[in-house]
């Protein structure tokens, strides 16, 4: 069963919302397609602490090994990655100290949260809360493979600050491949100091 509500597809079986794809004129379609560069960058953003061989990275990203060399050279020149060549083996790792990498990782993380449908779910589950705030290492682009996603929700329906876990978030955690922590608070009960 699929219900449509305000350009959002709602799949009740999984309690996950998927945004409707926008209609795009053919000449602009290339802007929306996922390119080989985006796929490789996505893997590096998702696993910034992992070291890849050329073959591993190509396989993870779903990109032909023959095409990956030029992309990696471009990423290396921009300082996004470090490449160590040991004879025929390449060791490729994200350069987490590079400001350009961090900035792009923040954009990737925010986009990832929106594409997963998590924001729409939280708005509906918490009955249109006053604020939903993404914070912590995931928001700063400093998250690693094992990091969690910290989300604060301002609601008048709670009396004290509390950290909760929702059973419904399990599906989102599978999509994002991160644990999600919800921090509920009421602005009046928070100490400003």
Question: Where are the model-predicted features located?
Answer:
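Catalytic core of pol beta-like nucleotidyltransferases
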Residues: 2-128, 140-146, 155-193
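Short helix-loop-helix/strand-helix junction enriched in hydrophobic and basic residues
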Residues: 131-138
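Short, well-ordered beta-strand segments
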Residues: 150-152
């Amino acid at each position: 069963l699929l219900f449509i509500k305000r350009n959002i597809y709602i799949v009740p079986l999984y309690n996950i919302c998927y945004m409707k794809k926008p209609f795009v004129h053919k000449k602009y379609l290339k802007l929306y397609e996922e390119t080989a560069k985006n796929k490789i960058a996505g893997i590096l953003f998702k696993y910034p602490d992992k070291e890849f061989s050329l073959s591993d990275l190509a396989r993870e990203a779903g990109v032909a090994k023959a095409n990956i060399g030029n992309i990696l050279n471009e990423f290396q020149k921009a300082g996004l990655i470090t490449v160590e060549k040991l004879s025929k083996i390449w060791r490729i790792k994200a350069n987490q100290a590079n400001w350009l990498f961090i900035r792009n990782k923040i954009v990737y993380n925010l986009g990832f949260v929106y594409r997963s449908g998590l924001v729409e779910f939280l708005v509906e589950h918490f009955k249109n809360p006053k604020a939903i705030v993404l914070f912590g290492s995931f928001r700063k682009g400093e998250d690693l493979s094992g990091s969690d996603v910290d989300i604060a929700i301002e609601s008048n329906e709670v009396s004290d600050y509390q950290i909760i876990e929702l059973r419904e978030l399990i599906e989102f955690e599978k999509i994002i491949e991160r644990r999600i922590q919800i921090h509920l608070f009421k602005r009046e009960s928070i100490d400003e100091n």
